[in-house]
A protein has these predicted regions:
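Small beta-barrel nucleic-acid-binding modules, primarily SNase/OB-fold domains
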Residues: 5, 15-145
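Sec-dependent signal peptide recognition
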Residues: 2-8
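N-terminal signal peptide c-region/cleavage motif recognized by signal peptidases
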Residues: 10-14
Length: 145
């Protein structure tokens, strides 16, 4: 209930805080951290206190393996760490970092979008290099098979 109340309070603030940002539009971004292979944190210093000045961006259209305690097996955890390391490596090697905003994810805590590194889609890189599968909200296939 508290999460729902917080979400109801935060969404109007977000809508008012950045009236220039529209879905499907590309913006320069400061990537603050890699959360996992398909999710990054970006600086959002425009968010009012007490909110964290960071938004989580989940790369739309892909699923990478989970890492750590969220993984269903040791193999998935290892692949999840590899996907995260790959994402970190691509970000570190890029000079131009941008995001393409799309929508809120189905849980409301992250923004769906794509990350462009030197103009190249992180989504495409993850899939092309075997670190992710295409995913559009359907039931996920296990990484442990």
């Amino acid at each position: 209930m508290k999460k729902l109340l917080l979400l109801l309070l935060v969404l109007p603030v977000l809508a008012l805080a950045q009236p220039k940002q529209r879905p499907g539009v590309t913006y320069d971004a400061v990537i603050t951290r890699v959360i996992d292979g398909d999710t990054v944190g970006i600086a959002a210093t425009w968010l009012p206190a007490p909110l964290k000045p960071e938004l989580s961006i989940r790369v739309f259209g892909v699923d990478t393996p989970e890492k750590g305690h969220r993984a269903q097996c040791a193999s998935e955890a290892q692949r999840g760490e590899a996907a995260s390391a790959f994402t970190k490596q691509l970000i570190a090697a890029s000079q131009k970092r941008q995001i393409v905003l799309m929508d809120w994810d189905k849980y409301g805590g992250r923004v769906l979008g794509d990350v462009l590194l030197n103009g190249v889609s992180l989504r495409q890189q993850l899939i092309a290099n075997g670190f992710a599968r295409e995913y559009y909200g359907e039931a996920k296939t296990s990484w442990c098979q």
